[in-house]
């Protein structure tokens, strides 16, 4: 095992996504929240989010995570897949993570134009969000969450 692989394993071992919520960015109202560690690789997670989230012009995502390890440049790359085809890609950067810290990270996700939005009935169960967790260029974990619109 290379030093990079070992480092990625150490970071992942000490990393936990404690909770996450999604809010309507305009009103601040929480639309969905969960405490499952959606960063765990190797399993397909599921999230049931309200259909009305699709009507929001922007969604504010708040992540609370703990890390035993220091990270120089913690960042996420996310891809939204519909029936296996990538529809959207997002990039988020948190930056430096203090070792043995718990952090809350808020990000704004702008919606696709309404003309490009598919109805919840078509999307539900067919959308997977793949999240890659990085420390700079070092891939730490890849997780997948299947979305159901309720």
Swiss-Prot record:
Presence of keyword Chloroplast: no
Protein's UniProt keywords contain Cytoplasm: yes
Role description: Promotes the release of prenylated target proteins from cellular membranes. Modulates the activity of prenylated or palmitoylated Ras family members by regulating their subcellular location. Required for normal ciliary targeting of farnesylated target proteins, such as INPP5E. Modulates the subcellular location of target proteins by acting as a GTP specific dissociation inhibitor (GDI). Required for RAB28 localization to the cone cell outer segments in the retina. Increases the affinity of ARL3 for GTP by several orders of magnitude.
Tissue specificity annotation: Retina.
Family per record: Belongs to the PDE6D/unc-119 family.
This protein's name: Retinal rod rhodopsin-sensitive cGMP 3',5'-cyclic phosphodiesterase subunit delta
Residue numbers spanned by region Required for association with membranes: 144-150
GO molecular function: GTPase inhibitor activity; small GTPase binding
Classification via PANTHER family: RETINAL ROD RHODOPSIN-SENSITIVE CGMP 3',5'-CYCLIC PHOSPHODIESTERASE DELTA-SUBUNIT (PTHR12976), RETINAL ROD RHODOPSIN-SENSITIVE CGMP 3',5'-CYCLIC PHOSPHODIESTERASE SUBUNIT DELTA (PTHR12976:SF0)
Example GO biological process: visual perception
Domain of life: Eukaryota
GO cellular component, one term: cytoplasmic vesicle membrane
Keywords of this entry: Cell projection, cGMP, Cytoplasm, Cytoplasmic vesicle, Cytoskeleton, Membrane, Sensory transduction, Vision
């Amino acid at each position: 095992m290379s030093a990079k692989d070992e480092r990625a394993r150490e970071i992942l071992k000490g990393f936990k996504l404690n909770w996450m919520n999604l809010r309507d960015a305009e009103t601040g109202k929480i639309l969905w929240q969960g405490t499952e560690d959606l960063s765990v690789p190797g399993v397909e997670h599921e999230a049931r989010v309200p259909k009305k989230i699709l009507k929001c012009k922007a969604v504010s995502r708040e992540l609370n995570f703990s890390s035993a390890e220091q990270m120089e440049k913690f960042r996420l790359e996310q891809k939204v897949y519909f029936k296996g085809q990538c529809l959207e890609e997002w990039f988020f950067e948190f930056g430096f993570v203090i070792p043995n810290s718990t952090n809350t990270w808020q990000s704004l996700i702008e919606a696709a134009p309404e003309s490009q939005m598919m109805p919840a009935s078509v999307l539900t169960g067919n959308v997977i969000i793949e999240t890659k967790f990085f420390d700079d260029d070092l891939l730490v974990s890849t997780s997948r969450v299947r979305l159901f619109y309720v």
